[in-house]
Every structure is written in C-alpha cells, then in structure tokens.
C-alpha cells in the first residue's frame, strides 16, 4: 500500500506544482513558487528511486486502477498506473533529469520575468511524461503523448517576443501532428481489431492478427506496427520528420536539456520497446525500423559536423543517438535500446546544460566566435569533456557500455546497419572534438570585453550537474550489471518480449567487436584534433564565420568536391528547402484557390450577395418616403385606380 501511494505521488507532485505556480502566478511569492517547484520534483525523484529499488530487488509490479474512464459496449478503459521494470527505469531518467533542470533553471532564468510560468510548464511536462510511461493502455498513453507535445510547443515558444521562437514552436507542433495522425490511426486500428486498448489484452492477441493478411505480404499487425512507428518517427525526430528538432533549440537551454535530449524525444523508443509484443510478430516493420535508425544516426551525425551553433550540433547529436536506439529496437535488442536511452539522458543533459553555461557566460551560440574559455570556465570544460567522452563511448563512461551493446546486437543480427553505426561513431567523435577545441581551446575570437568578463556560472547552475556527471559515470556500469542478469532481456525480463528469446551475447562476441566502438571513437578524436586544432591558425584570416567553417578544407584538386559536400551538410541536405517547395508552396497556392472560392464566389453570391439585394431594396423603398402629402395622395389614388381596373377587366373577360 505504501508503494502504491508513492507511485501515485511520483506522478501527482509535478502536476500539483504546475497548478500552484500556473494558477497563482500573480499571487504567490516568487521565492515560495521556486521552493514548491524544486521540492516537489525532488520528492518525485526520491520516490522514483524507492520504487526502482523495490521493483529491482523484489521484482514487484505495481498496477493501480485509479478510476473508470471509458465504457462503451465491450470497450472498457481505466485510468491506471502501471509500473514494471521498464516504467521504473523511465521514472528514474525523467524525474532525476527534470529535477536537475528545474534547479539549473533558477540560475539560468533568474533575470527572466516569466521564470515562474517557465517552472510551471516544466512541471506540467514532467507530469505528462510520467503519465505516458506509466499508462497501461494506448488511450492513456496517447493523452501523455499529446500532453508532452503541447508542453514542448509552450516551452519552445516561451520567449514569444522572438519571431524565430514562435516559428520554431509552430514548426515542431505541426510536424508532430503529421506523425501523430498515423499514431491515432494505429490506435484506432488496434481498438477496431482487438476490441480493447489495454496493453495486456492487445499483447496477448498479437500472434492472432499477425496471421491475418490484408495484402500479399502484409498483415493487420504489420499495418498497426507501421502506423505506431510513424508516430514514433515524429516524436523521436527520425529522418524525414526530424526537421523540427534543430529549430527547437530556439527555446531556453534547460528546455533543450529536458525535453529535446533526455525525455520527450525518447518517447518513441519507449513506445517501440513497450510494444515489443507486437513488433516481434512484424519482422518486416522491424527491418524498416533498423534501416530508418541506421540511416538517421549517420545522416544526423554528418550534419552535426558542419554546424556552427553549439546547441544545434548537440541537437543533431541527439537525433543521431536516437537513430542508434531505433536500430537496436529493429534488431530486437530492446533492452540495449532502453539502456542507451537512460545513459544518453544523463550525458546529453550534461552536454546541453554545460553548453547553457557557455551561452550564459558569453551570450554567443556560434562556436567559431568563441575559443580560449578553458581557463575562464574550467569546471564547465570538465563537465563538457565528460559528457563528450561518454557520448563518444570511451571507457569507463556510460556511453561505452550502452553504445557497445547496440553495435554488438546489430553485428549479431547480420545487419548492414552495423557499418553505419561504426561510421557514425567516428563522426560523433569528430564533432565532439570540434566543440571542445573551438569553444575552449586556442585563441579567443570573442570581443575583449566579453572574454574579460566570462566566468563560471553560479553554484545553483553548476552544482546540480554533479548528479549528471555521476550518471554519466555510473549508469553504464549499473545498467550493464542489470542486463547481465541470468534471464532473457536481463532486468527487463517481464517488460520486454523477444520471439526468439533474444539475450545479450555478452561473452560470445569476438574481442575486436567489443573493442571496435571505442577504437573508432579514439580514431575520431584524433581526426577531430587534427582537423580543428590545425584550423585555429587560419581563423584570424577573416571575420566571417562561414569562411572559418571552410578553413579546414585543404587546398587541393578535390576542394570543389569538398566544398560542395560541406555546403550540402551545412544546409542539412536541403530538407527544409525541399519541403518548402514540395509541400509549403503548393499549400500556399491551394490557400489562394480557397481564398478565391470563399471570397469571390461563396461570399459574393452568398451572404454578401443577399445583403446587397436587401440594401438595394431598402434604397428603392426609401425613395418612396418623400415626406410630401401630395405624393402619398398620388400613391393612394394610383393604387385605387389599379385595383378597380383589375376587377373591371376581370369581369369583362
């Protein structure tokens, strides 16, 4: 009973914090509002740790039916809380990172008048994310799914006086509506064919629908899984539906750390893992997931190399790492995908918040305009270095364990995407070293006054990062131990399903496969140092950042090709331009057609035309009202004459 109460409190506390700070924004004292937000989220994180230990040590699954929600014929849906191993580990990632971000925001947003509103939105997002991962049915999950989308819109556009922030918020919201439409269709199809939205009922009948073919090679289950995955592609920024994530960096940096690195963007990976009971019976969709994940991780990493905005580089890095996670799901290694999800939450949040420290200190996003900050911000440098090495996958940091397991699983499956994963590991190291060298090393390109006053942020911004540093170090070791348990899927044995009882072949891979990810990471580090350390001497040639970005390109016969490639990468493979010409402009033309039909035809001959007829009739009628008695006498006499004439003529004929 105690653990059930704790489970409820984990979810309710962020909601209560959001309601208090949101509704009483102009009444409550700012200091009290901050205390409420921080204390409630910290308690939620503490309770999550208790629940995690209980689920881990005792193996207990908590299922609480709070209240009946939908009852329609045979469809019955309850509002419930379902906590198994998968939910408990997600609770840890969400609440701990959210707590750190809340505390960090007190310093980062200290000068912002809307800080209480900001904290309210952050708490509301945390509530919806916890609702999403603790649902026991697809409809409740969808409520959390849409809730985090709305909060993302509010937080990206938090600085609503900036036009770029407003456009980014709208872009994120609309892009996700495209994928969410497929997600809704998937849920509707589940309800129609399964007659239920509850996980237990749907998963237990998965095999039945896998044998129900609607096309030659496609079953009903294939269609359901494909629709669900398209929903995941939008939320988790996979190739084609990724365009919103880099623009989302227009929001405050704490938002980027919480929503667009550690939590919301991983919701798609969580959904695929949760629905492993469905996806395992749809091998064709699993193959599609593997391909999309592999292409995305390489695609996003290649773009990150040529970006100059520090937050956008990390955003594309996030997109790339999400590709790794989906690649793992595609080869049925759901446990390593969730493992990487958790480790990634810690070191990527650390990278974003460390980048926030740099931006806060120098008020600049372009890394080619920075440099020499290692002596000014040594703690931030250390944090950024730890996060980068974890991202690259250097032992003993957490990324070494989780990324290694994904690549091992991909290798075991025989998928060609293993090669993509290895190339991505090299590119990851290169763009990580690019940031470190251009931001912290070499001669500064900042204005003298800005560089002179650059310093470490306050303790309230630096101290919370200790938790993320600890997570970047120890989450890998702990996770590796949990996955090494002598059960299928290790720690997640009751949450995940593998048709062929997939188990991590921890001791059965060749040694070179185990060492290859870190080896290529080291190679990438060396390449990055050679490229960008050497480019520092060229950076005094011009003040234009675009030229600085090209300075590393050697002067040779292949320079034209390299410049072309760099332009393609810098312009993000022209996805925005392609969408603008193929989708946006045709829609604008269609709107002009609708405008013409609405204004020139419907309105002109409809309500406006009717109004003109009435006005004309009124104008004619008004002319009769002259005010002269002889006119009225004439009208009366004329009427009498006409009437008498009518009856006389009628009698004659």
Curated annotation (Swiss-Prot):
Provide the E.C. number(s) assigned to this enzyme.
Answer: 7.1.1.-
Instruction: Spell out where the chain crosses the membrane.
Output: 8-28, 35-55, 89-109, 115-135, 138-158, 178-198, 214-234, 253-273, 285-305, 313-333, 336-356, 377-397, 418-438, 465-485, 511-531, 577-597, 629-649
Q: Which InterPro entries match?
A: NADHpl_OxRdtase_5_subgr, ND/Mrp_TM, NU5C-like, Proton_antipo_N
Name a biological process GO annotation: electron transport coupled proton transport
Q: Which domain of life is it from?
A: Bacteria
Name the Gene Ontology molecular function terms of this record. Answer: NADH dehydrogenase (ubiquinone) activity; quinone binding
Q: GO terms for CC?
A: plasma membrane
Compartment(s) where it occurs, according to its Swiss-Prot or TrEMBL record = Cell membrane
How does the record say this protein sits in the membrane?
Answer: Multi-pass membrane protein
Q: Name one Pfam family in it.
A: Proton_antipo_N
Keywords carried by this UniProt record: Cell membrane, Membrane, NAD, Quinone, Translocase, Transmembrane, Transmembrane helix
Q: Which family does it belong to?
A: Belongs to the complex I subunit 5 family.
Q: Which PANTHER family match?
A: NADH-UBIQUINONE OXIDOREDUCTASE CHAIN 5
Q: What does this protein do?
A: NDH-1 shuttles electrons from NADH, via FMN and iron-sulfur (Fe-S) centers, to quinones in the respiratory chain. Couples the redox reaction to proton translocation (for every two electrons transferred, four hydrogen ions are translocated across the cytoplasmic membrane), and thus conserves the redox energy in a proton gradient.
Q: Please state what the protein is called.
A: NADH-quinone oxidoreductase subunit L
The organism is Rickettsia prowazekii (strain Madrid E)
Whichever gene encodes this chain, its name is nuoL
């Amino acid at each position: 009973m105690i653990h059930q109460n704790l489970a409820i409190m984990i979810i309710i506390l962020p909601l209560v914090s959001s309601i208090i700070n949101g509704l009483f924004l102009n009444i409550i004292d700012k200091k009290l509002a901050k205390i409420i937000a921080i204390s409630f989220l910290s308690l939620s994180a503490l309770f999550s740790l208790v629940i995690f230990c209980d689920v881990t040590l005792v193996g207990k699954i908590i299922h609480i039916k709070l209240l009946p929600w939908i009852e329609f014929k045979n469809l019955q849906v309850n509002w419930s809380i379902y906590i198994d191993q998968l939910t408990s580990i997600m609770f840890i990632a969400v609440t701990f990172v959210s707590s750190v971000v809340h505390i960090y925001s007190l310093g980062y947003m200290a000068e912002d008048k809307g800080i209480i509103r900001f904290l309210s939105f952050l708490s509301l997002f945390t509530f919806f994310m916890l609702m999403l991962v603790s649902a026991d049915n697809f409809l409740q999950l969808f409520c959390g799914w849409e809730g985090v989308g709305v909060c993302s819109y509010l937080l990206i556009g938090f600085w609503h006086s900036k036009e770029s922030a407003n456009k980014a918020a709208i872009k994120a919201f609309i892009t996700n509506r495209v994928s969410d439409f497929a997600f809704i269709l998937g849920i509707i199809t589940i309800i129609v064919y399964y007659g239920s939205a509850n996980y237990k009922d749907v998963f237990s009948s998965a095999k039945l629908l896998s044998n129900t073919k609607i096309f030659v090679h496609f079953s009903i289950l294939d269609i359901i899984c494909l629709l669900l995955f398209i929903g995941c592609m939008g939320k988790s920024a996979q190739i084609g539906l990724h365009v919103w994530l880099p623009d989302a960096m227009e929001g405050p940096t704490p938002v980027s750390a919480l929503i667009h690195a550690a939590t919301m963007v991983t919701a798609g990976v969580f959904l695929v893992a949760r629905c492993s009971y469905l996806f395992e019976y749809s091998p064709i969709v699993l193959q599609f997931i593997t391909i999309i994940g592999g292409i995305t991780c390489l695609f996003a990493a290649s773009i990150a190399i040529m970006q100059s905005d520090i937050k956008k580089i990390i955003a594309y890095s996030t997109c790339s790492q999400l590709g790794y996670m989906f690649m793992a799901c595609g080869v049925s290694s759901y446990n390593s995908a969730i493992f990487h999800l958790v480790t990634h939450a810690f070191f990527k949040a650390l990278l974003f918040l460390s980048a926030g420290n740099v931006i806060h200190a120098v008020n600049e996003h372009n890394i080619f305009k920075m440099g020499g900050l290692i002596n000014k911000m040594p703690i931030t440098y250390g944090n950024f270095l730890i996060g980068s090495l974890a991202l690259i996958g250097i032992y003993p940091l957490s990324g070494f364990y989780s990324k290694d397991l994904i690549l091992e699983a991909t290798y075991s499956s025989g998928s060609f995407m293993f090669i993509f994963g290895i190339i991505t590991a090299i590119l990851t190291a290169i763009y990580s070293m690019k940031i470190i060298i251009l931001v912290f090393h070499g001669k500064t390109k900042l204005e003298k006054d800005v560089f002179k006053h650059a310093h470490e942020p306050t303790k309230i911004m630096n101290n919370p990062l200790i938790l993320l540093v600890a997570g970047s170090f120890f989450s890998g070791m702990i996770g590796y131990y949990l996955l090494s348990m002598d059960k299928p899927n290790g720690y997640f044995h009751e949450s995940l399903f593998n048709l062929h009882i997939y188990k991590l072949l921890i001791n059965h891979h060749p040694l070179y496969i185990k060492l290859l990810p870190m080896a290529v990471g080291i190679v990438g580090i060396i390449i990055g140092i050679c490229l960008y350390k050497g480019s520092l001497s060229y950076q005094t040639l011009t003040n234009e950042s675009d030229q600085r970005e090209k300075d590393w390109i050697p002067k040779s016969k292949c320079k034209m090709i390299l410049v072309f490639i760099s332009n393609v990468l810098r312009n993000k493979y022209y996805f925005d331009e392609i969408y603008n010409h193929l989708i946006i402009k045709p829609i604008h033309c269609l709107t002009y057609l609708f405008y013409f039909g609405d204004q020139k035809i419907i309105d002109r001959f409809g309500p406006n035309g009717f109004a003109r007829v009435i006005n004309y009739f009124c104008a004619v009628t008004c002319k009769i009202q002259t005010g002269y008695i002889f006119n009225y006498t004439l009208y009366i006499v004329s009427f009498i004459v006409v009437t008498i004439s009518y009856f006389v003529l009628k009698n004659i004929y």
